[in-house]
Curated annotation (Swiss-Prot):
UniProt keyword Secreted present: yes
Similarity comment: Belongs to the peptidase S1 family. Kallikrein subfamily.
Top-rank EC class of the record's enzyme: hydrolase
Name of the protein described by the UniProt record: Blarinasin-2
Superkingdom of source: Eukaryota
Localization: Secreted
GO cellular component assignments: extracellular region; secretory granule
Encoding gene per record: KLK2
BP terms from Gene Ontology: regulation of systemic arterial blood pressure; zymogen activation
Pfam families named in the record: Trypsin
Function noted in UniProt: A kallikrein-like protease. It preferentially converts human high-molecular-weight kininogen (HK) to bradykinin. Is not toxic to mice.
UniProt organism field: Blarina brevicauda
Region forming the signal peptide: 1-16
Main localisation: secreted
Amino acid sequence: YLLLLCLPLTLMGTGAVPPGPSIEIHPRIVGGWECDKHSQPWQALLTFTNGLDGVCGGVLVHPQWVLTAAHCIGDNYKIKLGLHDRFSKDDPFQEFQVSASFPHPSYNMRLLKLLLSDEMNDTYYYEIFPGADFSHDLMMMQLEKPVQLNDAVQVLDLPTQEPQVGSKCHASGWGSMDPYSRNFPRTGKLQCVDLTLMSNNECSRSHIFKITDDMLCAGHIKGRKDTCGGDSGGPLICDGVFQGTTSWGSYPCGKPRMPGVYVKIFSHVDWIREIIATHS
């Protein structure tokens, strides 16, 4: 979840935050509840290094492929599936190394690197942020071997049509539950939150980043419920259909009239299938 208000930290979730409007790249679950165990069997936990330790979510879209956020780029990837309590030694899960990763070619990786660089200063921050476009925030991760499908590990089907504004959705992840935390503490047990799909026009009036047709916005007018730091790449499921992955949002998470922003999966189905077909 990329925080629009605290960009330099958003990927790793620690460090100083520049003054002014924020944008967060790693959403976390705020105002939700503990998911029923293994009720989200497609949910993946991605850990990696990128100067600091990173945590993201992901979605199993094929027995050997996990979809996550492009801004979760790093090294030494490990992916866990079938997990509920990430701190429990007794929780059975499957763990995999990543043999190859494929960020979406249209994602603005150069801008992301600038936002996370030591060279960023307040002046440059305000010059570059308004209207910045973080579309196509997706990355495909090829596992070293196929998963073993069971009650706790299942593939989530890709959508066949776009969701409608007003759809009832839910998101899930192990991200922080504190909307004001600058250190992004993460929860141990998988959290779920209910959200409502909002119009992109309404969303664009709330955020300084560009809202495109390849994005979805979900939240609540009154706020209080949101994804947040550590939830990036996790699923947004609307009316029972996989429609989005967590991308970015405001700081603090869960602000009124500031919905979280998600990648519209329907716009990227062909790319996802092409990656799987070409590299499997």
